[in-house]
Amino acid sequence: MKSINIVECKNEDDLKEVAILAEKIWHEFFPGIISEAQIDYMVEQFQSFDAMQDQVKHQQYHYHKVYEGDELVGYIGLQNQPDCLFLSKLYLKDSARGKHYASEMFEYAKKQAEKYCYPSIYLTCNKYNKHSLAVYEKFGFQWIDSVQTDIGNDFIMDDHILEYRLNRI
């Protein structure tokens, strides 16, 4: 069974690679869940190089590249918050899905949460993204709330909020 290697982004070139991959992944995965116009808008607002650079510099985000061999196949975006770790982004290209890489990526996120002594990890996921919701539930996340967020340009993010409690003694 193949495995992945996860590497923290250290510079602008790393973030640029992630942003290019993000646009590809979003256009592979989200049609049928949200409109193409909303995909384009959300990529520009939240997944572009400029957005990621701002998140790293001003919002305590850190990004991690996911490799299968030498190929960049995914990325993770984490945000340090006062009381928990926010799993903002966990994405894989279509060719890397179904190989249990998401579970390896989640284990990596758990280690990051433990490193910062967080009691929990939370995330938001589109209510109509049934596959990802099922994966997160399998990982042990629990639904704690729902939220509709106006993100501008007449678009709404219609999400479930999920939480994973770390076993801490």
PLM region spans:
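Acetyl-CoA-dependent GNAT
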Residues: 6-15, 19-95, 106-108, 112, ...
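Short coil/turn segments at alpha/beta junctions that flank glycine-rich nucleotide-binding fingerprints
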Residues: 99, 116-119
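Substrate-recognition "cap/lid" segment bordering the active-site pocket of phosphatases
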Residues: 98, 107, 134
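Basic/polar N-terminal segments that are highly enriched at the extreme N-terminus
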Residues: 1-3
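C-terminal "cap" of GNAT-fold acetyltransferases
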Residues: 119-122, 126-133, 137-139, 146-169
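Residues forming the Rossmann-fold NAD(P)(H) cofactor-binding site
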Residues: 103
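Glycine-rich phosphate-binding loop
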Residues: 96-100, 152
